[in-house]
């Protein structure tokens, strides 16, 4: 009789764990999506994947053309230098969301080297994003 109760209790506990692990995926919050877009944008710049970097921007926006400018600058340096590297990082301090628009405050670091010269730029900045459909895109 005791063995029966153990099996029932074991089965109930197992059922509770399996229901808790039902495979349901928690949807990412808008803040997580925004941080991901900015992180992926930086990675695309670092990988020199210009089309991917621009895909994280609103087409024709200030940030879209900034990515085009970085690409042109990078390609121009490549005409004169064999090795050109770029490291672009953003450390996000705050994300504020208002409807389909978001403001991100953080610290930006850009290090580019070409022909033995190093170009550094860093400082605090504001980044602005717009929700297009279900996707956040950088516009300024």
Regions found by a protein language model. Name each.
Residues 35-36, 50-97, 101:
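Short solvent-exposed beta->alpha transition segments
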Residues 1-19:
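Sec-dependent bacterial lipoprotein signal peptides
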Residues 82-84, 94-140:
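Exposed beta-sheet edge and beta->alpha loop/turn motif
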Residues 10-11, 20-47, 55:
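Short, low-complexity N-terminal intrinsically disordered segments enriched in polar/charged residues
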Residues 1-3, 32, 130:
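Generic cytosolic/nucleocytoplasmic N-terminal low-complexity/intrinsically disordered segments
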């Amino acid at each position: 009789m005791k063995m029966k109760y153990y099996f029932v209790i074991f089965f109930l506990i197992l059922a509770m764990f399996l229901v808790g692990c039902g495979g349901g995926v928690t949807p990412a919050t808008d803040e997580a999506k925004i941080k991901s877009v900015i992180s992926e944008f930086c990675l695309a710049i670092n990988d020199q994947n210009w089309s991917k970097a621009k895909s994280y921007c609103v087409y024709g926006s200030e940030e879209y053309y900034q990515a085009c400018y970085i690409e042109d600058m990078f390609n121009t340096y490549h005409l004169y230098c064999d090795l050109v590297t770029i490291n672009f990082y953003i450390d996000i301090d705050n994300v504020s969301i208002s409807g389909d628009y978001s403001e991100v405050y953080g610290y930006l670091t850009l290090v580019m080297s070409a022909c033995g010269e190093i170009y550094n730029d860093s400082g605090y900045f504001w980044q602005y994003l717009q929700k297009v459909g279900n996707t956040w895109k950088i516009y300024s």
